[in-house]
Amino acid sequence: MAARRRLLLLLVLLLCRLAAVLPTSEVEALQGFMAGFAGGNAAFQSWDASAPNPCTWFHVTCGPGNQVIRLDLGNQSLSGELKPDIWQLQALQSLELYGNSISGKIPSELGRLASLQTLDLYLNNFTGEIPNELGNLSKLSNLRLNNNSLSGAIPMSLTTIQNLEVLDLSHNNLSGIIPTNGSFSHFTPISFSNNPRTFANSSDSPSNNSGAAVPSGRSSASSIGTIAGGAAAGAAMLFAAPIVLFAWWWRRKPHDQFFDLLEEETPEVHLGQLRRFTLRELQVATDNFSQTNLLGRGGFGKVYKGRLLDGSLIAIKRLNEDRIGTGERQFLMEVEIISMAVHQNLLRLQGYCMTPTERLLVYPYMENKSLETRLRECSDSQQPLDWPTRRKIALGSARGISYLHEGCDPKIIHRDVKAANILLDEKLEAVVGDFGLARIMDYKVSHVVTGVMGTLGHIPMEYLTAGRTSDKTDVFGYGIMLFELISGKRGFDLVGLANEENARVHDWVKKLLEEDRLEVLIDPNLLEIYNGGEQGVREEMRLLVQIALLCTQESAPSRPRMSTVVTMLEDGIAEHWDAWQRKTIVQASLQGGQGVSEARNDSVANLPPDTLSGPR
């Protein structure tokens, strides 16, 4: 018995030692990683080298065993170089460094991250070649290196990554042949565009255009004969070339088009690894689009629940007839761009179907449906959303929208951010949906659209009156969605409550906050913990209200970017809130104390319904 106790004690000590060693080595790896960037960056404020465990640091996510599985440092104004120390994070699954100013070469040591699934280094200043070692990342599914200054050939080793689903090497200085074998056979030219020195196959190589040297040591007559023969052959080729080129073009035409527009009955067409379904498959999956499988309807069409032959559940958006007028090429280009918007907080496009009379989009089915459903149509078997879950949903949805604005190329405006379009997965994580047919945002500037799309209570004045949309349109919608999350009420209902006091929603909530009467706004399911003063909860709710107020300001330029909202949710709001309070005081003094009622013209309560789209 004593021997068994000693053995058990030894095992406990060994496990404790192992638990202490793993985080320490990861702390050292992260410190080495951080050392590559210019000092003083706010993203690393919580990265304390003396901490035994990095799992409490901002932008770091840990999995089982307290091992780092994700580094999310996109759009953090990082400058410097990516140090190779990061290879020591052997459990790392996602490395997101997009939208910074990181320079230097991509370390070949990244090829040693055996668990890596997502590598996002796009929109930086990386130079040099793509490391051949990246081909060792057998679990990699998302590789985006676009918008850098990478050069050299595309490594053939990348074609051996069987799990690769998303690839973007565009907007670099790559050269040589674009591989078409292995996993690369699924990708279209958009993945390699804007690399002027690349070509599709060896016959397009510049080296094939150089002339052949004339052999020396021949007689003058032989030379003349050679020249004459060459001239005759050249003349023959001149006449034959158009025929040969036409035959070559005709044979290769289905493969060289930007999108392969095959008939509906040939489902093997893919955009990336996006599946093309037949209409028959989707009819069988939905029992011929029966009403019993109808999940909802909106401005873009109806959504049905379906079950494929392998048993997997899907959600099918059947687009309205007015969308069918979109040309095949235009529709496929939209599908291609949206399919490349891959983020854990975005609804992943799984496939599509296109016929002369139908346009359908296929998504994974979300068992927990939408935030709106959980807030207002909770079944008897479901508990109301608690405060930690709502806080998690606020952060997750902000990350998803921020990625649409700053992580996609071209950028995407959602234009209808609301609780109904925030879906919930099996862990109640936020998944932003229904951005599938949103207008594509210009890379540098906003643009004017011809028709207002959105939902009553979620539309800012600049969009409603002038049709001018930008990323700040989504910021406004997100702010109203936060009010929905806190109150459990629809945006339209909040407009009605504010109108009773002759004010906009923004001004009404601001007044409640200033008068310490937020219990008027807060969901009855949360009032007990709010009034009970549970540690930190009351302050967290006030924080979320403050962020929502910043997002719903009347002036679009004054609203924060979504990446700033993410930072505020993670790090705090004090600096932004104080600056806004000072600005409000100055504006009030300049206006000579004009009443709040003047802002009523920003309300959309009295507009006819036909100026707005329905819920999507």
UniProtKB/Swiss-Prot annotation:
Active site: 416 (proton acceptor)
Keywords, sorted A to Z: ATP-binding, Brassinosteroid signaling pathway, Cell membrane, Glycoprotein, Kinase, Leucine-rich repeat, Membrane, Nucleotide-binding, Receptor, Repeat, Serine/threonine-protein kinase, Signal, Transferase, Transmembrane, Transmembrane helix
Residue intervals of the Protein kinase domain: 289-573
Ranges per topology, Extracellular: 24-226
Membrane topology: Single-pass membrane protein
Superkingdom classification of source: Eukaryota
Location of the region described as Disordered in the Swiss-Prot/TrEMBL record: 594-616
Record topological domains on the Cytoplasmic side: 248-616
InterPro entries linked to this entry: Kinase-like_dom_sf, Leu-rich_rpt, LRR_dom_sf, LRR_N_plant-typ, Plant_LRR-RLKs, Prot_kinase_dom, Protein_kinase_ATP_BS, Ser/Thr_kinase_AS
Catalyzed reactions per annotation: L-seryl-[protein] + ATP = O-phospho-L-seryl-[protein] + ADP + H(+); L-threonyl-[protein] + ATP = O-phospho-L-threonyl-[protein] + ADP + H(+)
Enzyme Commission code(s) on record: 2.7.11.1
Parts of the chain that traverse the membrane: 227-247
GO biological process: brassinosteroid mediated signaling pathway
Known role: May be involved in regulation of plant growth through the brassinosteroid (BR) signaling pathway.
Family membership: Belongs to the protein kinase superfamily. Ser/Thr protein kinase family.
Protein name per UniProt: LRR receptor kinase SERK2
Gene name tied to this protein: SERK3
